[in-house]
């Protein structure tokens, strides 16, 4: 029912984004980014709350102007999830949002001005205990690095990242995490592998500009799956041209599939064939929607016939093995006397799952921030 992940995670230092621990064995944090106009406070707050509802640990907000910084102040007062301010070029914006309680600054020290300006931001972050995320992207490398390498390479992304890391090192600031994102899976993976050998700080994973919901999810799962399976990564974002809520769902699904961090129901369902005795596809789709609010980790198997049904059910918290008119029901791997009417499986199983989740939650005192 619960198989421990065989993955041994890379040892890293620990930082905190608000109250969320990052690195040094902490649960891998799942985050997203708002796509509203930050100056539209109501829309931005609503989106942040929708992200928090589906489990977002951290939310990033773009703050491109001083007007956006003023809006950020109001937004921060209305939400509880830790917020990262995404800032480029203007160091004054970083100083301003620091005064407004930002939980993390996403800046690249090398692009916010001269040494004095960089030092002022870093000193402010140190004084207020605000971590920094260095964010390198294959599509926006420094001009001299572009000229040197001609095209984005793993070595180019690493050089860019280390340039910013060296700045923070010179200023004796070690409360930071780093990302080296690229839209190409192999480029991103190779870049993170190189970086993981160079620094001890936490790594923020992502395949940038991955695409739409379907293709982007697949690309992210492949790239991040490779890295996570090697123990690389302390926090992640799935970058989709889609509703940011989907980014959180996909992020947790990737972690769940690797048994790294589980949230909610893990459905094991057959692709169906002519042997199915109940409508598996409709059942899975309906239950996924109805049970989105559950955070308790559970394995639920929905198999349409008795070929694989009993075997899957025996290693699940709950399971259905399809049979004629009434299907067999399993709980904790044991077949129950009760059988489910094939025409009413969804309602019956939802009630059973909710009751089981409540029991497990009470027994284990489930705190989603500690599920790892």
Swiss-Prot record:
Leading EC class: oxidoreductase
EC number, as in UniProt: 1.17.7.3
GO molecular-function terms, A-Z: 4 iron, 4 sulfur cluster binding; 4-hydroxy-3-methylbut-2-en-1-yl diphosphate synthase activity (ferredoxin); 4-hydroxy-3-methylbut-2-enyl-diphosphate synthase activity (flavodoxin); iron ion binding
GO annotation (BP), single: terpenoid biosynthetic process
A Pfam family reported for this protein in Swiss-Prot or TrEMBL: GcpE
Role: Converts 2C-methyl-D-erythritol 2,4-cyclodiphosphate (ME-2,4cPP) into 1-hydroxy-2-methyl-2-(E)-butenyl 4-diphosphate.
Name this protein carries in UniProt: 4-hydroxy-3-methylbut-2-en-1-yl diphosphate synthase (flavodoxin)
């Amino acid at each position: 029912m619960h198989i421990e992940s065989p993955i041994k995670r890379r040892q890293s230092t620990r930082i905190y984004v608000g109250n969320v621990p990052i690195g040094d064995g902490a649960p891998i944090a799942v985050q997203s980014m708002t796509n509203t106009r930050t100056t539209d406070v109501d829309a931005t707050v609503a989106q942040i709350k929708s992200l928090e509802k589906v489990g977002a640990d951290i939310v990033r907000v773009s703050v491109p102007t001083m007007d956006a910084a003023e809006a950020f102040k109001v937004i921060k007062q209305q939400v509880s999830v830790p917020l990262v301010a995404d800032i480029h070029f203007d160091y004054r914006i970083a100083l301003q949002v620091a005064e407004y309680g930002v939980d993390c600054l996403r800046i690249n020290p090398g692009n916010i001005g001269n040494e004095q300006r960089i030092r002022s931001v870093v000193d402010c972050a140190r004084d207020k205990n605000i971590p920094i995320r260095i964010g390198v992207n294959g599509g926006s490398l420094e001009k001299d690095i572009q000229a040197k390498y001609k095209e984005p390479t793993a070595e180019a992304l690493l050089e860019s990242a280390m340039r910013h890391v060296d700045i923070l090192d010179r200023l004796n600031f070690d409360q930071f995490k780093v990302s080296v994102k690229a839209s190409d899976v192999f480029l991103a993976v190779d870049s993170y592998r190189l970086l993981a050998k160079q620094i001890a700080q936490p790594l923020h994973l992502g395949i940038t500009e991955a695409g739409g919901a379907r293709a982007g999810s697949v690309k992210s799962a492949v790239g991040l799956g490779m890295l996570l399976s090697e123990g690389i990564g302390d926090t992640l974002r799935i970058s989709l041209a889609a509703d940011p809520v989907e980014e959180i769902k996909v992020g947790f699904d990737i972690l769940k599939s690797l048994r790294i961090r589980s949230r909610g129901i893990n459905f094991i369902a057959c692709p169906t064939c002519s042997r199915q005795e109940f409508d598996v596809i409709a059942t899975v789709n309906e239950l996924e929607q109805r049970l989105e609010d559950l955070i308790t980790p559970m394995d639920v198997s929905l198999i349409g016939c008795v070929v694989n049904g009993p075997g899957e059910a025996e290693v699940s918290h709950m399971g259905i093995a399809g049979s004629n008119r009434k299907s067999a029901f399993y709980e904790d791997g044991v077949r129950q006397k009760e059988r489910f009417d094939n025409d009413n499986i969804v309602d019956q199983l939802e009630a059973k799952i909710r009751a089981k989740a409540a029991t497990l939650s009470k027994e284990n005192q489930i705190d989603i921030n500690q599920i790892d």
